[in-house]
């Protein structure tokens, strides 16, 4: 089983990584192409394109300017440890053992507007480039056109390396839209996490994001390799619901949030 999750806007490059092991992103030639184009934008243009404050636009203009593909632990950090935010709060990667990180390296991928697809130990430098950004480029009108079917092809390669065809989608709609389902040689398992609110079960963004991270952790810890085993997910009050689920969409319900 291969999992995909979204990246995060919030980054942590201050806390020292919990491991010195790292790998190099596999698709940096594509990243360099985007960086070359992004360096041509002024902070004001970045602000308009990405809907950022002047301060954040200036920060990211500086990031694009200093981006250097010669990644080391001095100028970059492992992606799974650098991303923060709700999904990564649920995943708690900083407490994974070496053996669990090894398993994650083979079974988890992070979708990225700049890097395309990242493995957990791939080094990355700080950036802001959401997949939904309408950055016109030589390949089309936005980043979905830029990446085309490449991400799907790379996922196919990762699945082939495993001898498996099961892809667990724990990413947001914005990011999983960069995966062309028609190009995937895989069975996709989608997930939904709903909380009880005002008498109805609803997807509440903050909780759903955290739950995606918790399920990622569950798969890594238990080495889950089938949809049937995924149904045993029982963390912080979520329970599998057969009535709302289908064979390819697993729905988990929770009656009250637990800390």
From Swiss-Prot:
GO terms for cellular component: cytosol. InterPro entries: YaaA. GO terms for biological process: response to hydroperoxide. Belongs to the UPF0246 family. This is UPF0246 protein PSPTO_1244.
């Amino acid at each position: 089983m291969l999992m995909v999750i979204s990246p995060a806007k919030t980054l942590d490059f201050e806390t020292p990584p919990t491991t010195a092991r790292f790998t190099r992103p596999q698709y940096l030639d594509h990243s360099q192409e985007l960086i070359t184009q992004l360096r041509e934008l002024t902070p004001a243009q970045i602000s308009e394109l990405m809907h950022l404050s002047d301060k954040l636009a200036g920060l990211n203009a500086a990031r694009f300017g200093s981006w250097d593909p010669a990644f080391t632990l001095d100028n970059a950090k492992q992606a799974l440890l650098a991303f923060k935010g709700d999904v990564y709060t649920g995943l708690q990667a900083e407490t994974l053992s070496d053996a669990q990180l090894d398993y994650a390296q083979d079974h988890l991928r992070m979708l990225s507007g700049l890097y395309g697809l990242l493995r957990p130990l791939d080094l990355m430098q700080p950036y802001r480039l959401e997949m939904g950004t309408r950055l016109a480029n030589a390949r089309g009108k936005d980043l979905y056109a830029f990446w085309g079917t490449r991400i799907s092809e790379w996922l196919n390669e990762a699945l082939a390396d495993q001898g498996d065809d099961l892809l667990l989608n724990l990413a947001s709609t914005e990011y999983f839209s960069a995966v062309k389902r028609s190009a995937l040689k895989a069975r996709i398992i989608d997930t939904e996490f709903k909380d009880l609110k005002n008498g109805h079960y609803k997807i509440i963004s903050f909780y759903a994001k955290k739950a995606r991270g918790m399920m990622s952790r569950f798969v890594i810890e238990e080495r889950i390799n089938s949809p049937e085993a995924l149904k045993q997910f029982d963390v912080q009050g979520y329970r599998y619901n057969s009535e709302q689920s289908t064979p390819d969409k697993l729905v988990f319900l929770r009656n009250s949030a637990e800390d």
